[in-house]
């Protein structure tokens, strides 16, 4: 606060408990206003707000200073994708001249032009066909009079998933989905089923799309001396953290999510699914014995604040509970931290003995926020986190690819 006041900026926050509304008054000193208006430009002040439940949000207070007809403004972070963006500017004086933006790859000589859309005093233009991970510059123009402010942005990277073809494996009971000495991205429930001397997710060279292997996820009754529990074959981005024993049954603790900042529009890959009849329902309210089992794949991008277990912080921590499923800490598909989400259920076996292509569109709930993590989960029994499904239900996965527009 002292540094802000020294620069000429002061503020006062108030919270009305009756209306449950907070307000902030920001005051600019005469010296700061003189400095801001000394040359054409836009100044952005980022405002952070935190509520009593420690949930945060932020907004931008944008101040424009210009004696020109139009002023180029910085793009909004969420408007920059891999191959498209929204340019922004402001109308400072009324004019009958046509309003456009000029843009180009930084360092090139040729400008492209696009017509601006005027909404009140705000100018915007959506541009497409941009190059991935490339820096562009742009300027707002009225007639032939261009703003003296040139702004820049860099398109997103089209990041892909490590070991997306499921070619790298090592170990047995548990089997790991990465090479020995390598870096883990994917993990499985093999750490839990190993106590019963079995793996539920393995490499398979007999069913595949490309390369040498696919990932084979098989639902099993993992038991020792006849005592055990149903376990769904699964693979997820993250890490299996622990098995907490409750008598003779085990409850898994999983850290879901890996760092990720790009925004794909879909997850594409290849799958074969064999659905068996549900023979364990563990009182699950979503599926009954005798029903056909359901396979599931979902992708989530979000900016979760993170949860800590064993000294490690993960975007999401999942805790299953065999005896009292209602007390489990399962994934919340309605979380406010989810930015983009897509899922696909397989309610019956896929046709034939080979793999078929699947495509899961990602629907973005927010476009003004960027993700910090990606969660991808696949299961041979959708309700495996309730210890419910059909033994023998099997899902093969291969050649995952993130699709970008």
Identify the function of each model-found stretch.
Residues 2-30, 107-117:
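Low-complexity "stalk/linker" and mucin-like segments enriched in Ser/Thr/Pro/Ala/Gly
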Residues 36-37, 126-131, 364:
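Short, flexible loop/turn segments at beta-strand junctions in immunoglobulin-like
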Residues 68-75:
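Proline-enriched interdomain boundary motifs that mark the N-terminal boundary
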Residues 30-40:
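Extracellular/luminal low-complexity segments enriched in Ser/Thr/Pro
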């Amino acid at each position: 606060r002292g540094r802000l006041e020294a620069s000429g900026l002061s503020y006062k926050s108030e919270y009305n408990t009756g209306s449950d509304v907070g307000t902030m008054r920001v005051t600019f000193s005469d010296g700061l206003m003189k400095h801001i208006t000394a040359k054409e430009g836009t100044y952005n002040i980022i405002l952070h707000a935190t509520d009593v439940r420690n949930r945060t949000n932020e907004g931008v207070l944008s101040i424009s200073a210009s004696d020109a007809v139009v002023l180029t403004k910085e793009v909004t972070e969420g408007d920059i994708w891999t191959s498209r963006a929204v340019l922004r500017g402001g109308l400072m004086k009324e004019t009958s001249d046509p309003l456009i933006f000029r843009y180009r790859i930084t360092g090139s000589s040729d400008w492209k032009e696009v017509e601006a859309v005027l909404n009140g005093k705000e100018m915007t233009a959506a541009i497409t066909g941009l190059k991935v991970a490339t820096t562009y510059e742009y300027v707002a123009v009225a007639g032939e009079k261009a703003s003296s402010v040139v702004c820049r942005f860099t398109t997103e990277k089209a990041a892909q998933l490590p070991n997306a073809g499921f070619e790298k494996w090592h170990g047995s009971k548990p089997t790991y989905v990465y090479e020995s000495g390598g870096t883990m991205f994917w993990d499985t429930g093999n750490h839990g089923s190993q106590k019963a001397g079995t793996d539920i997710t393995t490499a398979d060279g007999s069913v595949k799309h490309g390369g040498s292997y696919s990932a084979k996820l098989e639902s099993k009754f993992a038991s020792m001396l006849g005592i055990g529990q149903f376990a769904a074959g699964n693979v997820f981005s993250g890490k299996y953290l622990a098995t907490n024993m409750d008598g003779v049954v085990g409850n898994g603790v999983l850290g879901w999510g890996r760092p990720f900042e790009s925004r794909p529009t879909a997850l594409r890959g290849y799958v074969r699914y064999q659905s068996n009849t549900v023979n364990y329902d563990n009182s699950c309210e979503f599926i009954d014995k005798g029903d056909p089992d359901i396979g599931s794949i979902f992708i989530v991008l979000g900016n979760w604040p993170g949860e800590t277990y064993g000294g490690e912080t993960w975007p999401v921590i999942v805790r299953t509970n065999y005896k009292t499923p209602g007390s489990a800490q399962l994934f919340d598909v309605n979380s406010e931290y989810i930015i983009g989400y897509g899922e696909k259920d397989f309610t019956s076996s896929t046709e034939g003995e080979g793999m078929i292509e699947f495509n899961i569109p990602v629907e973005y709930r927010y476009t003004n926020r960027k993700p910090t993590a990606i969660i991808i989960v696949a299961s041979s029994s959708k309700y495996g986190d309730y210890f419910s499904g059909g033994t023998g239900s099997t899902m093969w996965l291969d050649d995952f690819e993130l699709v970008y527009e």
